[in-house]
Design a protein with these regions (language model features):
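Hydrophobic (often cysteine-bearing) scaffold residues that line and stabilize catalytic clefts
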Residues: 13, 47, 84, 105, ...
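Short helix-terminating capping/connector loops at secondary-structure junctions
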Residues: 10, 123-126
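Basic, flexible linker segments flanking DNA-binding modules
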Residues: 1-59, 161, 215-226
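Mobile genetic element proteins and their domesticated derivatives, centered on retroelements
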Residues: 1, 17, 21, 51, ...
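An active-site-proximal beta-strand-loop segment
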Residues: 52, 56-96, 102
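RNase H-like two-metal-ion nuclease catalytic core shared by retroviral integrases
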Residues: 37-41, 132-134, 140-144, 154-176, ...
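Active-site beta-loop-alpha junctions of metal-dependent nucleic acid enzymes
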Residues: 80, 98-123, 139
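C-terminal domain-tail junction helix/linker
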Residues: 148-152, 174-270
Length: 270
């Protein structure tokens, strides 16, 4: 192609041609195939979706979980994947459990769950729901038994619609396309270190429109429905249904400790 269109009587060799392509940014970017992280054809027992109309009003009422992949480059053209398991508190938007693994084995989601469970150690009267897709990891006996041993109710998506687990899907997107954007990893240890830093930033420094521009760490000090600068599709649908049924509005949050809204007292809307 180069010889035909540009070289005339001055052809170049392969290596020089590659150097020119690289110098001017003309190399075609290798398209990474996306692995499938959810296998819902496993035949294991699943659970119904019990959070369709539920909006949490305090921490540790609803946890949402999902798994996503991160690419590891072995050389310029060869890559493998590792897998990030996340658990998010749906009220605070805080990542409370995570694990990185080289495979999709249940071991790694269980590690993330065990990390999250430290948040409720010693607490009584837990009224907590764990929501996930119907993947084999979340339906496995090891994962299900661990939830049941801690008195946590289990909810799973009933279709393949991403909106059924939209909050967990959204944090996956934030992690990969914002917090880790532009990073190129060559080993799993580098991934683990970068994810740890990203999660600390996400939880403690990054304000969220969905929790009134608080950080998740600040939202964890609140009780009651937090005002939102942005409302998800799911929550809009729930609110529309509540309005149609004439369900009263909830109280504003009580937030404890330091933060932009510390000391706010609950006010019942007229």
């Amino acid at each position: 192609m180069y010889r035909r269109d540009f070289a005339g009587n001055d052809p170049i060799g392969r290596d020089q041609f590659v150097d020119i392509i690289n110098e001017y940014g003309l190399k075609v970017r290798l398209k990474v195939r996306k692995p499938r992280t959810t296998d819902s054809t496993h035949g294991l027992p699943t659970f119904p979706n019990i959070v369709k109309g539920f909006i949490p009003t305090a921490p540790n009422q609803l946890w949402v979980s999902d798994i996503t992949y991160i690419t590891i480059w072995l050389d310029e053209y060869t890559y493998i994947f590792c897998y990030l398991s996340l658990i998010l508190d749906a009220y605070t938007e805080e990542i409370i459990g995570w694990s990185i693994g080289p495979t999709l084995e249940t071991t790694y989601p269980v590690e993330a769950l065990r990390m999250a469970l430290t948040r409720i150690e010693g607490m009584s009267n837990i009224n907590l729901i764990h929501h996930s897709d119907r993947g084999c990891q979340y339906a496995s006996s090891e994962y299900v038994i661990l939830l049941q041993e801690h008195g946590i109710r289990i909810s799973m998506t009933e279709t393949g619609d991403p909106k059924d687990n939209a909050q967990a899907e959204r944090i996956n997107n934030t992690m990969k396309n914002e917090l880790l954007k532009g990073m190129r990893f060559t080993n799993i240890d580098d991934v683990r270190a970068a994810v740890g830093r990203a999660i600390y930033f996400y939880n403690n420094e990054r304000p969220h429109m969905s929790i009134d521009m608080k950080t998740p760490a600040e939202a964890a000090l609140c009780v009651g429905e937090i005002p939102k600068c942005w409302i998800s599709y799911r929550e809009n649908a729930i609110r529309a249904n509540q309005t149609a049924l004439d369900i009263p509005e909830k109280t504003l949050p009580l937030c404890i400790g330091q933060g932009a809204h510390s000391g706010l007292r609950p006010i019942v809307n007229p």
